[in-house]
Amino acid sequence: MLAALLIIIATGCTVTTKDPAYVPPAPLQPMEQLEKAPLADAKTFSSGDDVLSFITADRTVACSLTSARGEHLNLPYEQNRYSDASNNKLPIVPVAYCELATYPALQPDDTKGDCAGTHLGYLGGVALLTPDNARYGECRSGVTPMEAAFGPKGSKTGPLAQLPVLADGQNLERNGLRCSAYNDGVACGNVSAGVGFFVSPKRYELIQGPAKTSHPPQSEGQKTP
């Protein structure tokens, strides 16, 4: 022991120990994270046609900063009707869209009726941001593409598996909307309007801006199998 101590002194080395009383700072609130986190180089995440797409390092959330015509999203990794001629009359709106491999159940207030009589279920696992609104859930039958790829029975293959990883703490921005990978999930928002969402496998939060009611963060509860 003495010999080891003498070697440390002679070489000028220092030994650090963890402070048992240290408490790491709490994560920033979603909108603060989006405002303050550094922006990543958008070129790395461009999939053409003015779309930025990424997946988180743990492969739990995949998102795109893209455009929508009505309910039709321009997603390069999924079949869609965004470019159909019949939709050209619809206005183009910038959006952020995220899918989860496993996800929290919907809060009752976020369930949107009977899906206009289509007999589809209104299910969680996706979040959509427009410049003035954020929502969680959608009308669909079956699993999300992320659930099919990276859920409990996922194939771990396909277009989503090829998306570039947005490192934890980084931000992406397109047409006034931002997304950031942080706190074991992803936050997306329109910082100037105070509208956004946070999604993770354990919980979600919708932030509707100062003129609307924001949902409190969801406690960790029921998830999809």
Describe the role of every protein-language-model region.
Residues 46-60, 108-109, 168-174:
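Extracellular glycan-recognition/adhesion modules and their associated mucin-like linkers
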Residues 9-12:
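C-terminal motif of bacterial Sec signal peptides marking the signal peptidase cleavage site
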Residues 20-44, 70, 75-163, 195, ...:
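A low-complexity, Ser/Thr/Gly/Pro-enriched, surface-exposed linker/loop concept
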Residues 152-186:
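An exposure/low-complexity boundary signal
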Residues 57-70, 173-193, 218-225:
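Extracellular/lumenal glycan-associated surfaces
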Residues 6, 56, 91, 108, ...:
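Residue-level signal for mature regions of secreted extracellular proteins and peptides
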